[in-house]
Amino acid sequence: MSADLRKRKKDTTADNDAPQEAQAEEENKKEKPSSCRYRFLWKLLLGLLLIALLFGIKIHRDNELVRQQEAALRTLGAEGLFLFSSLDTDNDMHISPEEFKPISEKLTGISTTSDYEEEELLDPNGETLSVASRFQPLLMETMTKSKDGFLGITHSALSGLRNWTTPVVPNNVFYAGQFKAFLPPKNKLEVGNPWWIIPSELSIFTGYLPNNRIYPPPPKGKEVIIHKLLSMFHPRPFIKTRFAPQGSVACIRAISDFYYDIVFRIHAEFQLNEPPNFPFWFSPGQFTGNIVISKDAAHVRHFKLFVPNNRTLNVDMEWLYGASESSNMEVDIGYLPQMEIESLGPSIPSTIYDENGNIMESRNAEGEAIEFVFEDINWQSEMTFEEAARKLEVTMYPFKRVSYYPFPEAFDRALAEKKLVHSVLLWGALDDQSCUGSGRTLRETVLESLPVLALLNESFISTWSLVKELEELQSNKDSYATFASLHLEKYNFPVEMMICLPNGTVVHHINANYFLDITSLKPDEVETNLFSFSDGVEDLSTVTYIKFLKEGLEKAKPFLHS
């Protein structure tokens, strides 16, 4: 009985509590949105305050930096500030010991050990490779400015160029393991499959690196061996060029059981002047070459690196006349007869053992060096050096997916295939780093556009030529001299694009500067009747170049059918 009574009381209490809990829960639900809203507003307010604080700190730091730069300008002058800025690589307006090191080495004549090294430690007992550098200075008379005796050019501007007559390190010794950077990645082990040793970080969209620099940044990783090699020529090599395409690319030319023959192409440049003179940039068209190396990088059979000298001009030069990036700049091009590094023989063990495991002297009783006999390499799969170099060229320059033939051959092919000639005439090579500014823009934009490539491949034979080469060809007495004269009559600095008949007649042409001007218009400035955005092509430069090519085809019809 008493138990039933307790149960009824408990049930009554539970029934009374249920409405109260429901009521409390309902009130909490009403309060919860309001509470969440307040918490959200507080978080938003705190976030905005934090952003404002960070923005204020940035403004303060920027103002402080401007104040320091203005004070430095008053103290040092423009040229002094330029020298200071060239050393201040992190732009904090303070020179650290590491940043001061180039000046210290210059004043004391003592080069300290570099902090940077390969990512992997080298085997001190590994094989060593002896190499020699060969260098013949640029022929000053090949520069355009030489025609008027370098009128208006200060002696100090060219001092670094004039004084560079020999390599700074004629001979050097490397560990074979240092050349491991040239080995292919695991997914590029086939003949003719290119890979990037040092990737390019620039494009037409990212712009270019500053001109007003004196000293190169410390190399990292795979850049180290290339930096050390090029430092044999000059103490200030820049492994990352100012203009695209940067970097180094390679592919396997041949494979055997134990060796690769690897062809490579390197884009690098040098800054020749020393403070207080302003920078002078020396940009060879390219470094190319090959290395025969064991698959484990323990042995190097052969190594050669060189600047091709088969063209009449192969080096671009640019120098500043002021301390800022906007200062006046002179540009010229010239011919470099020789710039190469070659191994003096295969790599050899640093320690020599006899058949009993005893260490031997490196020279015999007569004092002559012990000669090593190396087995012949039987290549199982291979291509020619030229074929491999072509693969690398297309990797660096996608516009070369269309073949560009030598000037005479282009007209012979056009006659045989009944096509027109698409010709680009300029004063720096279109397919290397000696190219001029507007030529660079063309090859990195419109000439590599897929619609343009398709039309060129279908209806034209393409060629590009140096002005200097056609001037020399013009002086000959063969039929191509007339073709050269017809080209030069239409040429305007710096680049002229032409459409020609197989007999050399120029039926249509456009200057690169004019082309770039009209294709840089804003969309609302473009006359709709001037351009037709058909076939799904919306890029103005591509549309304009296709229009130029089609106009050439149209203008050639009366001549082709006559």
From Swiss-Prot:
UniProt keywords, alphabetically: Endoplasmic reticulum, Glycoprotein, Membrane, Oxidoreductase, Selenocysteine, Transmembrane, Transmembrane helix
Protein's name according to its UniProt entry: Selenoprotein N
Protein purpose: Plays an important role in cell protection against oxidative stress and in the regulation of redox-related calcium homeostasis. Regulates the calcium level of the ER by protecting the calcium pump ATP2A2 against the oxidoreductase ERO1A-mediated oxidative damage. Acts as a modulator of ryanodine receptor (RyR) activity. Plays an important role in muscle development and differentiation during early development.
Organism: Xenopus tropicalis (Western clawed frog)
Compositionally skewed regions (Basic residues) per UniProt: 1-10
GO molecular function: oxidoreductase activity
Transmembrane segments: 40-60
Subcellular location as annotated: Endoplasmic reticulum membrane
Keyword Oxidoreductase (UniProt): yes
Glycosylation-annotated residues: 163, 310, 457, 503
One Gene Ontology cellular component: endoplasmic reticulum membrane
Region (Disordered): 1-30
